[in-house]
Amino acid sequence: DLLYRRGGAYERIGNFEMADKDLLDSLKINKDDAYVLNYLAYSWLERDYKIQEAIEMLEIAYSSKSNDPYIIDSIGWAYYLVNDYIKAEMYLKRAVELMPDDPIVNDHYGDILWKLGRKIQARYFWRSVSKMEDVDQELLQKINLKMIKGL
């Protein structure tokens, strides 16, 4: 819908106040829209904002779209941010299975593995990102640093 697309556009240019307004207004129309819930929740996770509320939104999104790899990645990352590494690993392992060529998903999974003490496996997933094509330079720099120093 229009509010979802406009909210996404605002979010991409960094106007988070307007993005949140449009995305929340979109949820007033359809409170269970999994894609709007995921977009808004992930945006909040990226800003370290309303983490618990974002997790609740992602659980709703996941309940209706349990095979959507983006939603699975988001909920896994949310659990990572609250240090629930066991739950996070369960979701992110599935996200990697569904999107093995996605750099963000592989990066997230590597981070989880590192936190679980599986450092060789973590470096394997980070290294796979460094070999992918068209990876954002900023992400590549972070990956290269992780491969050297870890987390």
Give each language-model segment a name.
Residues 8, 42-43, 77, 111:
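Residue-level recognition of tetratricopeptide repeat
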Residues 29, 64, 97-98, 131-133:
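Structural marker of alpha-solenoid helical repeat scaffolds
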Residues 103, 107-108, 115-151:
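Terminal, low-structured helical/coil segments at or just beyond the last alpha-helical repeat
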